[in-house]
Amino acid sequence: MKCYTQVYVMNSLEAAQTYCRAFGAEVTFAIMNGDETAYAHAELSVNGEGILAVAEAPEAYDVGAIHRMKWQTMTFNAFELGSRDAVRRAFDTLSEGGVVLEPIHELPWNPYCATVIDRYGVCWWVGV
């Protein structure tokens, strides 16, 4: 089974480039919206493997709700990146204009990891 994350964000063209920088990915498939200003669907890959699909959100969402509500469940995108340098690059890129929930730290199950909500409202956990 192949599984990867789909995110719907405002400014999908910019977001896709941010995620390419963060994860060393490239856009390998893209369908633009009707006026060619955003992605209807784009696929990002690393070494030929799809890791993320990005599409334009149909309208702006109140990302601030994430900070105002107490959630009983949590969902986020988990990426094991394989090296401390890759984690640092992803963390630095994703935290630009975002909110750091957990800075890079050590856990019993991962020696170098962090959690951040990026400027598009997507929550990421990155680790080695």
Where are the language model's segments positioned?
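Vicinal oxygen chelate
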Residues: M1-M10, Q17-I117, V126-V128
